[in-house]
Every structure is written in C-alpha cells, then in structure tokens.
C-alpha cells in the first residue's frame, strides 16, 4: 500500500493553534483543547495511507482543483492529494461559512 508524505501549510497550523487557543482560553477548557488538537493532528497524519478515502468538496473551482474534505469532530480538514504528497491547506470549524473562508485564503 502506498504511503504519502503529509505536509501541513502554515495557514493550517495557524488554524489548529487558533482552535486550541479558543477552546483553552475562551472556553477555559485546556484539557479539552489539547484533546481536540491531538485528534485533529492524528487524523491529519492518518492521511499518509489512502488519502482518497475522503470526498472531494462540492463547490467549484475547488472540486476541480482536487480539494478534499475530512471531518474531525466539528472541524473540517481540507487537503489536496498529489503524486507522493498530501498537502493540508486549512482546518476550519465546520459550522462556519466554509466556502467563503476557503476562498479568502487565496
């Protein structure tokens, strides 16, 4: 079975840090924040095997560009599968306007 190299963009890392900070500092739940951060990180790392298991997004032009979405609790991990690499672009709260936030990063 093919194994991919998983790369996380600076923006996606920042997204994860903001998720942690919000839960730890605003909601005053540091243990919950660490657990959520770890679940997202583990899910991202699992993309090294069978990254195509998650669906392409439904919106265009992101779908044509190969952007995929993986759900982790209440968060969406957006990534693109390349020849040997999985590139994680964003990690966003799923209840937000995902299309608008995805397009804002361009």
Positions of PLM-derived features:
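Basic, Lys/Arg-enriched alpha-helical interface segments
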Residues: 1-63
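Surface-exposed loop/turn and secondary-structure junction residues enriched for glycine/proline
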Residues: 4, 9, 59-60, 70-74, ...
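Basic side chains
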Residues: 7, 39, 53, 68, ...
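Enriched for short, Lys/Arg-rich terminal
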Residues: 27, 72-76, 80-106
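Alpha-helix boundary/capping detector
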Residues: 38-49, 66-73, 96-97, 105
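Basic/aromatic recognition patch in beta-strand/loop cores that engages polyanionic ligands
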Residues: 50, 54-85
């Amino acid at each position: 079975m093919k194994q991919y190299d998983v790369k996380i963009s600076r923006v996606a890392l920042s997204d994860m840090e903001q998720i942690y900070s919000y839960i730890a500092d605003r909601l005053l739940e540091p243990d919950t924040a660490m657990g959520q951060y770890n679940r997202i990180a583990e899910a991202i790392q699992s993309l090294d095997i069978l990254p195509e298991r998650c669906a392409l997004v439904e919106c265009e032009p992101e779908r044509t560009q190969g952007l995929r979405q993986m759900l982790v609790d209440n968060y969406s991990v957006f990534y693109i599968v390349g020849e040997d690499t999985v590139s994680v672009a964003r990690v966003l709260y799923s209840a937000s306007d995902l299309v608008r936030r995805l397009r804002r990063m361009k």
